[in-house]
Amino acid sequence: MSVQPLLDAAGRRRSPATMPGFRAGIAPRNKGQSYPADPPTVDEIVAVMRQAGHDRHGHRLSALVVVLWRAGLRIHEALSLTETDLDGRRGSILVRHGKNDRRREVGMDACGWSAIEPWLADRVGLPVGPLFCVIDGPTRGRAWSDSAARVELRHLALNAGVRRRFAPHQLRHAHAVELMHEGIPLPLIQRQLGHSHLSTTGTYLEGINNEEIISTVHARRPPMMHASAGLAL
């Protein structure tokens, strides 16, 4: 059945899908689904950033990838940032609206700060507002929506040839695993990620980092067997 256009308050024709409350009360198609933790590799992340290009849209998308990956923010934390929340001199990012609206300050490395510079330069020419904002059109300068950012990330990853799920939280996973591999103490990783309890961080990393068990089992010696067993390994 075709969707009949409606008229908004200004008398303009609009599809019901664009009207406020269109899907109110309807659960999203992926409600209840869980996705395995599968952080992208550095090569895959860099490939996505290169695919983004060098215009303002590309700079914005690359900067979002960097903040999720090199600072480990949640997507809503990143999209809630303002320009004044960034302190490049100290290398810090102020998260004003973390999970359960908790406030915290996190760090980001020099590589990350260098990578977001093109977007910071572009952002100066746009209206004051959220760090990650709409670039064109009547809503220019307003907050970039979560759904729009996710769609762009997904399309960019496909175009870059990334064959695994490339979602904002996967980049946060990558950040956590990298910190652990670098020997960062678990309590510091907990504070960086904004977990309320250390046990949450331990469980989080246990589920997404299997290198130790893989390397240990892979290095096992072959089984000892009697020469007459007739089994060649």
Please describe what each predicted stretch is.
Residues 1-233:
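Conserved catalytic core of the tyrosine transesterase superfamily
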